[in-house]
Every structure is written in C-alpha cells, then in structure tokens.
Amino acid sequence: SMPLINSKGVRQTPWSEGQNVRHLEPMGFIKFDLLGLSTLAMMETAIELILKRHFRNDNPTFSDVKSFYDRYLHPDKIDLNDEKVYENVFHKGNFVGTFQFTEDGARNFAERVKPNNIIDVSAITSIYRPGPLSANVHEDYIEAKGSPQYIKYLTPEIQEITEETFGFLIFQEQIAKIAHALGKDLSLDEGNLLRKLLTKKGTGKGFEVKDRIHKKFIDGCIEKGIAQTEAQALWEKFEYFSGYGFNKSHAVCYSVISYQCAWLLTYYQAEWIAAFLDKEPESRKEEAINTAKSLGYSIAPVDVNTSGRTWEITKDGKTLIQPLTSIKGFGESAMIQVLEHRPFKDIEDLLFREEVKYAKLNKKVLDRLCRAGALDALVDDRFTGRKHFWSAAVVERPKTKKKFHENIEKYRGEGDFSEEEIIHFKTELTGIFPMNLVISPETIEKLKEKFIPPISEFDEELQICWFIPRKVIPKKTKRGKDYWILQVIDSNNETEKITCWGIDPKKDSIHINRPYMSRLEYDPKWGFSTRSMYRNFRLLG
C-alpha cells in the first residue's frame, strides 16, 4: 500500500527524493492520467437542456444529469452500432461540436471512410495524425475498407488480429498480439514489452531484450511456414509502424466520447447546438453561430426580459435565444439583479425599481445592455431612435424620473444609431453578425438573377461571387512580399478564407463588414485566392 499524508488540506503521497511516476509500475502501482475535457461540460449542459425541455425538470441537479447519462449515454448502455447516428453525423459530415472532429481534415476523412462501428471511428482518429498522414496511410485505408475482398493476409493469425482494421497495423496492441501469435514461445507480456521497446532507440539493456524477442519472433514465423524474408519484412513493418502507432484502449475510449456527442447531435440536435454555442470560446463564437444558422436555426437577439444565463431554446425548437452572458462585461452580480427582478415593462421600470441594487446594475452595465440591443424592446414611441434612448437613459444616467423626462426632450434630435454603429456594437459586444444590415435580401436576389452566387456556392467556371470581409490578416512571404488572408462570410452563414497576393499596403484597402463582388481562383488544396485586389474586387452598394 502507498501511505497518504495531509499537507495543507490536500491528500498527498510522500515520495522519496529522486522518485517519479516512472517508479510506480515496478513498485506494483497503476498510474492514472486524469484529463479534463471541455466536451464533458458541453454534454452536461446539453443534458440539462434536454431534461428541461423533454422531461419537465426546470431545475435539474447533477444527480439528474448523471441519471440521464447512466440510462442513455453510459458506454454499457448506449447502442454503439446505431446506423442513424453514423449516417447522420459521420457519413454526412454533420460534426457540430463532435469531439475529435473539429478540423476539416478529420471531418473529410471520416466522410470518405463512412465508419459503421466504434472501431472504425477509433481507426479514423488514430490515422488522422501527422505520422500516418505523411505515410499516406489514410488513402490506403480508405481503399482497403472500400474493397475488403481484395485484402491479402500473410497468415490466418494476422487476419484475425487486423481484419477489424482492414489489414492495417493501426493500434499498438496489434503488435503485441501478432508477436505472441507468431513468435516462438513468445508470451503476451513479451509482446507488450516489444510494443514499448519499439518506440525507444538505443543500444542498452532494452536493445538487448528487443534483439532477443526479434530472434524468437523470426524463429516462430519460420516454424509456422513463413519465409524468413517475409518474417523480417513483417518485423520491419512493426518498427515502421512504431513511429505512428496508437494505443487502442486510449483511441476507443476517446471515440466513445465522440460517439456520445454524435448521439446527442442526432437525437437532441437543438439542445446539443445550444450547448455547443454556450461552450465555444469567444474566438470561435461567430463561426459557431453561423453553423447554427446554416442548420436552420434562428438566433433570437439578446433581450433583458427573455435571455438567461445560457443559450435557451424556444418551445418550437427552431430558435436559439442568446444569453445575457454573451454580452462582454456583463457579470454575475448584474445577472442576478436582472433575473430576480424582471420582467421590466418599460425603461422606467428598469431604471427606478426600488428593490434593484443599482450599484450592481450600474451605468456601465446599462450601457452594454443598450448598445448590444438587449434593451430594444423597451424603446417606445417617446424616442426618435435607439441613440436617443441611449443618450437619455444611459449616457446621462438619470437619478429621478423628472430628470429622465428632461433628458428625453434634451436628446430628442439624436435619432437612431447608424448602421455602421449597430454592426460594430453587435459584433463587438455579442459576437453576432447582423447580416441583414450589411446586405439586403433584395440585393442578394438581384445578384442571384445575374448569376453571381455567394462564395459558398462558388462556380469554378463563372469564377465570380460575392462575400463580406470580416477580418484582414496581414502576412508576408518568405521573400518579404506582403499578402493578406481575408476571413469572409456570406448569406449562407458560411465562412471562407481568401488569399490576396501582391498586396500594396499603401494602395490596397478593404472595407470590413461591407459586401464585395470579386473574381477569384479556387484550388481544392489551397482554397480561394486572387492575384490582384485592385482589378478583381468591387464594393457593392
């Protein structure tokens, strides 16, 4: 047993100086690596929403969440061969928020493989790494899975061990099993030792043990009728594979989590999308919102009377309500004041409620609520626009109703915010891009009539499309030449990147959040590009 001590309230194990985790196994202990995954928090949020919407549980506890998980998602209970899950997610490429499938490359690979079971998924995640990809294993694997009848196995033992991966050595455990099956008096423990030694280099004791196992393996293969050259080739395949082999137990465990995400996405899509929006980091929030829109969901703007702590779902399941927490700078203390005292029937009700603690719901918070659009529903016909409302109620924060009414008259000429201001406020404070303010549906229809599609529907023959730049990333080539990467969006809420070569920073310019029409080149590997912004870009409107 290992002794425990209590040090500053934390239980610890008293290690002797110089000892570390590598000493655990020889001493008879098992080392566990406990990893925290944000995906698990996303699953918890999704389950809470499911319990609220489908099980009439308005305040689910962690115990309630665990009960749902144990009943539907636990590895011992979930159906890992559900065709609907594989078809809906892995075959169609609908991977929203799916663990291990956040990159386009992994998604495209999975779509081409079309996995049918958890081992297929594990193989995909094991192959989609730098080593196997550089060795072109992914292409060979796709070909083999598509035509398994043409796979040739050296021996029945190898077929039994590698048939689930279509003849490929994908998992480290396969080496241990093949070495045990074909080697002369080679135990499973020695096979497992070989698995470990193959990943190490050197001429010490480990090398001597590997050399001994090598001899036993070759001798065993020869006794089983395998030619020495073929046996040696198989051994060399072991050594080559050790450069990129993956642990099966690890791969399968992680793939089960991927499958659980896919199951939630298949059977409770709205809840999963809401949880996905809630947990995505700020840097990817806009892209996540665009993904939700592309799946047919409407995004209800943030509202002081209807928005909550997290993304919520309307009763019809078609609209996702942006939370108050999505407003930058809107903290927990202000949240408590809003949730405890709403609904607010008008702006006076918000500004002068006796029980509201205005030290928490202060001018800075009100400013963010107003500019983010969360107070738009409180703008009545006394105001000439939202800027008038903002100036009277927030900028010169009135302490009395009399002062507020004076402010209404004082700032009557303010009117509304400009479109540029609204776009800036929305994107700066909430992360939602107001497409309808940037390009009108009428303009989009006219472009369609002229056969000018959005960039997501780019036609390589026409080469002309339209888009809205959202971000400019200046770059330099190895020779010091300037170029830009444009991050753009279109009416399908799909984001793309355009490489703009030959940039002259003194002459070339781009207007963010304004629609452009352009002639572009497209390469399947490198994406969209243009050789001249000056010749090929035209500002619309």
Name what the model sees in each region.
Residues S1-G541:
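Noncatalytic, beta-rich nucleic-acid-contacting surfaces in large DNA/RNA-processing enzymes
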